[in-house]
UniProtKB/Swiss-Prot annotation:
Role this protein plays: Binds the poly(A) tail of mRNA. Appears to be an important mediator of the multiple roles of the poly(A) tail in mRNA biogenesis, stability and translation.
Other remarks on this protein: A.thaliana contains 8 PABP genes.
Repeat among keywords: yes
Tissue: Expressed at low levels in leaves and young seedlings.
Residue span of region Disordered: 503-537
Ranges of residues in domain RRM: 21-99, 112-188, 202-279, 304-381
GO cellular component: cytoplasm; nucleus
Name listed for the protein in its UniProt record: Polyadenylate-binding protein 6
Composition-biased stretches (Basic and acidic residues): 506-517, 525-537
GO molecular function: RNA binding
Species this protein is from: Arabidopsis thaliana
Highest taxon, organism lineage: Eukaryota
Length: 537
């Protein structure tokens, strides 16, 4: 994609179109605010205003801004001093702002704009500008980056078409840091789409290249079929060949002749594949159609293609073939990789028949490779996988969320007593079952029953007090002297009357028991049965 175009000449060489100095500042970090820009630009020159463009809906920064100065001279000084300097980790791209709509429309067509590729990873936007500035006034210069790393190409826009032509003639094919520069006129998106739709394409795709093949080797091989305008072997972040490249001819007939002659040629240990270069979307659609046709023509193919995941980052196709090769003849093996050549952690292995793939799946599923257990499954088309998942979820019974009903109360029974302690530890008032956590929520309308527990330890034979409790193996035991409170979980409408009668009966029996023990001398007057003041709600 082209750079955002600037619209005026640099001050000193050309007259600025506005009486005020206005600069466009692009490639900003999303975290940059208006205050950051003011602090950065107002160190040596006065800033009149700053406008950071934001999304009208989300309010997020669009990563570019306009800064107005009191004069074009101040703006020129700021651009000279701060262009390509860092602000919150990203290099700013500064250029003159232009309000002339006609000029802006013309720059969108690629006016005086150059596309530069085969750049060394050490070349920055500032280095690229110094390389091209001897040929004229530069409006915009940028090396395209991803995650802070150069992608090996960039754009340079001059103020005149003549300057762009001079730079292209002088620098195209020159060696910079051991790489041959490719400099060409920038072609906008619409023109590229029209060229891609042309069946007589001049761009050729070459794969199955051995690691030692360079751009010069590829140029020598293909130039015997016609004039070659550009050659590139794609490489990862470490500079290693990714095994494929592109060759562009000046004549479509020469490109067609090269494809017919070189496809299948043995180059080193591999056979070349040479075909028409396609856009990523076109290639994906073609492979999708080819895969679907194979499934229709060869139903058994679906069982011979395996999906392998949980692969290490160092996994490559050669190792994948070595691992699966002992179980049969491998038709193809592919490890899906990022642009830097690192494995995405999954891949595909296709065998010549389904019996071989079944054997490989049986013995290699869960097999440790580089310390990781790999997962081997039968590969599915995306449509089949979506359909299978939909059928699975439709077959599951629907679960409706509703308020839980009150649990049926257990029947109250005589409480038994531990041999070590005098009573059970009851649940706290207003809580749910202690041993069930939050599984049984407290329901409104449930009754809280306070029971009567002796304050001290009494002989085992005298422990005959009645308590309304629920049997449960995890029911905790209280220490001696503890005050007991029991939550009776029951339905009000069904058990209110029974609970009231039980409480009255229990209270009366405890008073009689206290009186009898006191008179008989078995219970001291200080030890009393304590009744909570908590009444039935």
């Amino acid at each position: 994609m082209a750079l955002v175009k600037t619209e005026t000449q640099a001050l000193g060489n050309h007259q600025h179109s506005s009486r005020f100095g206005s600069l466009y500042v692009g490639d900003l970090s999303p975290d940059v605010t208006e205050k950051d820009l003011i602090d950065k630009f107002s160190l040596n020159v006065p800033v009149v205003s700053v406008h950071l463009c934001r999304n009208s809906v989300t309010g997020k920064s669009m990563c570019y801004a306009y800064i107005n100065f009191d004069s074009p001279f101040s703006a020129s000084n700021a651009m000279t001093r701060l262009n390509h300097s860092d602000l919150k980790g990203k290099a700013m791209r500064i250029m003159w702002s232009q309000r002339d709509l006609a000029y802006r429309r013309r720059t969108r067509t690629g006016f005086a704009n150059l596309y530069v590729k085969n750049l060394d990873s050490s070349i920055t936007s500032s280095c690229l500008e110094r390389m091209f500035c001897p040929f004229g006034s530069i409006l915009s210069c940028k090396v395209v980056e991803e995650n802070g790393q150069s992608k090996g190409f960039g754009f340079v826009q001059f103020d005149t078409e003549q300057s762009a032509v001079s730079a292209r003639s002088a620098l195209h094919g020159s060696m910079v840091y051991g790489k041959k520069l490719f400099v060409a006129k920038f072609i906008n998106k619409d023109e590229r789409a029209a060229m891609a739709g042309n069946q007589d394409s001049t761009n050729v795709y070459v794969k199955n290249l051995i690691e030692t093949v360079t751009d010069d080797c590829l140029h020598t091989l293909f130039s015997q079929y016609g004039t070659v305008s550009s050659v590139v072997v794609m490489r990862d972040g470490m500079g290693r060949s990714r095994g494929f490249g592109f060759v562009n001819f000046c004549n479509p007939e020469n490109a067609k002749k090269a494809m017919e002659s070189l496809c299948g040629l043995q180059l080193g240990s591999k056979k070349l594949f040479v075909g028409k270069a396609l856009k990523k979307d076109e290639r994906r659609e073609m492979l999708k159609q080819k895969f679907s046709d194979n499934f229709i023509a060869k139903p058994n193919m679906r069982w011979s293609n395996l999906y392998v995941k949980n692969l290490s980052e160092s996994m490559n196709e050669t190792r994948l073939r070595e691992i699966f090769g002992c179980y049969g003849q491998i038709v193809s093996a592919k490890v899906m990789c990022h642009e830097n050549g690192r494995s995405k952690g999954f891949g595909f292995v296709c065998f010549s028949n389904c019996e071989e793939s079944k054997q490989a799946k049986r013995y290699l599923n869960g097999f440790l490779v580089d310390g990781k257990p790999i997962v081997v499954r039968v590969a599915e088309r995306k449509e089949d996988r979506i359909k299978r998942l939909q059928q699975y979820f439709q077959a599951q019974p629907r679960q409706y969320t509703q308020a839980p009903s009150a649990p049926s109360p257990a029947q109250p029974v005589l409480s038994y007593v531990s041999s070590s302690y005098g009573c059970f530890q009851p649940f706290q008032v207003g809580t749910s079952y202690y041993y069930m956590g939050n599984q049984v929520p407290q329901m409104s309308g449930h009754q809280n029953i306070t029971t009567y527990v002796p304050a001290g330890k009494v002989p085992l034979k005298e422990r005959r007090s009645m308590h309304l409790v629920y049997k449960h193996p995890a029911y905790p035991v209280a220490k001696r002297g503890a005050k007991q409170t029991l939550v009776f979980k029951g339905e009000v409408n069904r058990n209110l009357e029974a609970a009231t009668c039980s409480k009255a009966t229990t209270s009366e029996e405890n008073r009689k028991e206290e009186r009898r023990l006191t008179l008989s001398g078995k219970l001291s007057p200080e030890v009393k049965v304590e009744e909570s003041g908590k009444q039935l709600q």
